From Swiss-Prot:
Name of protein: Bifunctional uridylyltransferase/uridylyl-removing enzyme
One Pfam family per UniProt: GlnD_UR_UTase
PANTHER family membership: BIFUNCTIONAL URIDYLYLTRANSFERASE/URIDYLYL-REMOVING ENZYME, BIFUNCTIONAL URIDYLYLTRANSFERASE_URIDYLYL-REMOVING ENZYME
GO molecular function: [protein-PII] uridylyltransferase activity; phosphoric diester hydrolase activity
The ACT domain, residue ranges: 737-818, 848-922
Gene: glnD
Region (Uridylyltransferase): 1-379
Amino acid sequence: MAKISLKLDELIDGEALRREMTALTTATAGDGSGAAARAGVLQLLKARLAEGRKIAEAMLKEDGGGNACAERLSHLMDELIRALYDFAATHVYRVKNRSSAERMAVVAVGGYGRGTLAPGSDIDLLFLLPYKQTPWGEQTVEYMLYMLWDLGLKVGHATRNIDECLRLSRTDITIRTSILEARFLWGERKLYDELMLRFDHEVVRTTGPEYVQAKLAERDERHAKAGESRYLVEPNVKDGKGGLRDLQTLFWIGKYFYRVRTGEELVEKGVFTEAEYREFQKAEDFLWAVRCHMHFLTGKAEERLHFDIQREIAERLGYTTHPGLSAVERFMKHYFLVAKDVGDLTRIFCAALEEEQAKHVPGFNRIFLTFQRRKRKLAGTSDFIVDNHRINIADDQVFERDPVNLLRLFWFADKHGLEFHPDALKLLTRSLGLVNKSLRRDEEANRLFLDILTSDRNAELNLRRMNEAGLLGRLIPDFGKIVAMMQFSMYHHYTVDEHLIRCIGVLAEIERGDGEKVHPLSHSLMPGLKKSREALYVAVLLHDIAKGRPEDHSEAGARIARRICPHMGLSAADTETVAWLVENHLAMSMTAQTRDLNDRKTIEDFASIVQSVERLKLLLVLTVCDIRGVGPGVWNGWKGQLLRTLYYETELLLTGGFSEVSRAQRTAAARERLAEALADWPDKDRKRYVGLHYENYLLTVDLPDQLRHAEFVREADAAGKKLATMVKTHQFEAVTEITVLAQDHPRLLSVIAGACVGAGGNIVDAQIFTTADGRALDTILISREFDRDEDERRRAERVGRLIEDVLSGKSWLPEMIEKRTKPKRGAKVFKIPPRAEIRNTLSNRFSVIEVEGLDRPGLLSEITGTLSDLSLDIASAHITTFGEKVIDTFYVTDLTGQKIDSPARIATIRNRLMATLEGIAPERGGKAKAAAE
């Protein structure tokens, strides 16, 4: 890659800075120990630091050089520290004739020692002494440190003599690494040279294997802490998998183990090819550019690439929007491809550690505890061997000789449960050019791939290895297009390719029964889907394969499936099944979460999509995999319950079990069942209570819940309470039910929703019923927060009391919402176009209003308030959030119980809802005007 001119002289003039600092002591004959001189020096250093950083940021924006920026910032700090040391030694703690003990070397260590700094990086310094500390040394160090701290810098420091450094480095890997990266800054050069010479001979020379083990273990621990996946959509640029620290770890090990000082020497040692080392440099430069931009933009040492800065950094780096992919999505795709390259380099490097040239290094065979290499033949092949419990290549021509071996490597690894030897993965990565049209159409290659995909051992792991090695995207070019692709959304936790691979893992988990308690229905259906098993696995792998294209990804994905599946060896029938599943993979999830499942029209419409019980079963399992594979915390028991309800209702209709009895007859039967269940009530009370409820309540609410409601209302009436709440926890469904009894009024649901927001409750569903005596019996479901029922019940009762306080006027809703809520981090950077639709074809009895927009605290309360102002009667509400996006659906009628069919009225409703979504306050008299229309 082209070398960028550093232009270091434009950042800071060290000599000029010294002259300016010295000039501050003119009035005191060169004495800089006074408070005035110190204040002047501090002000001067602050100005030069700010100027230098501003110039470095401008240069980064101009040339985009990440390494160059890090080197410039390091040079800026070098000059400041050198000038500060000279000032302290010359003007503050002046000693005419220093003793041999009054010597010091200022040494940059750790990251700063590499000569690279991010704007918010720690400044790690070693004050190196020849012997014990002296008063002069102690005062000088203290002066420098306090000045650096007053500059707002985070300084890590140690004051040690050479013997202490060596003794501590033998037992502390962190100290050993910091000295490994040590760089002389200022002072006595001989002290630094002696330290480095003795460190190399007394520590490094005899501890290579131990150091390698420790750094690799440290890397694994760091990944676990920062996020194990390389494809988390808010990655940690410094410590995450595929981040800067991984590259630095490779270089540390290289310097330590191969005794080199520069990266170029690793090419000379045969560790990397020249092309691979260029990849190393490009990856490092890109990651440094991203990290420096992050620090400049946030004004702090921010290491996680949060959503709220991704868009700005994409703009700074010059990314533009292309059809199907926004600028920020293109930037993040590049980021994840770089992270993947870092993974490739890591595998190649680990392979090099085990290659022949490394065995000449003393102690190499002790790097890994099991490194006595035990090789044996692998049954069924002469191309691969088992090398120390890992599958390896028999020779370097394995893939060249027969490209199908690229697939056989993974097939044999899966069959025998073997890990991969780094040599095999290194050669595979270097052989990806062998994947061509002929291999993609090869019958055996496709059979092997299908076996790997549908394996009952560990398909997820092998697919991830194939993907990280680059084979999966080469084998299926359409899959290659979504490798490292992120979706700029708070809902999606992983890149598209990682999501698909995780979905395969969920499917295997369902089939094994590992998650039977989480999704019992899906698990129970799997044995009956054996004939369609291959089609199901392929559909799960391909369902998002067309993401990032301008057209609808479900329809485009179906076309891709019809083209790919025959080459995989699927029959025409299975190919069509896969295509149908891909095209409709969102249908069940969206229907379950955004429609009223008690409305027969919902079930009829969904049944017309699936048309058969077999497809219904397949779509349910795919839907579960899709939601579970999005990321932690997305799946919950409530979503599972919605899917099960939709499944059972649709299955009943498809098998002819749906009753054709008239609504009036069913209402009469339900009323009779309720009366019979209340047989122990006095006749007068029973007749009165049963007569309170309208048909929608009787046909929608299960009898056990009707009986709970009856006792609840009876107790409230006996106590003379016009306002009451009742709670019930649902552990398996992960929701808590709160029933509210109150005098009916138009804004009731709006007030309840606002109270829930103020109490920290997240409403996921609501059923609204009125009684013949003018009361409302509303049931809301809120997301569960606690594991133990006792804790959740106490929390729900607190929410219930808050609802009562708001409805009775004891608490003021706007103040409570403002006090108890704040927007999700990063939500403000997302742009969700607001949408409001009023449709009369989704229900036979209700108009269905669907709104979509950017979620914010109190939005549900605002929307329901708007609907009430529009004189609409809400029968049910279904609330769904996808990260920063909310989709709320309301089943409504006008105040006479009729659908909204006037075009003018529909337009008014839509305009008011759009204004609410956009945060525009309604005009005065809006309610009266809307009602008149």
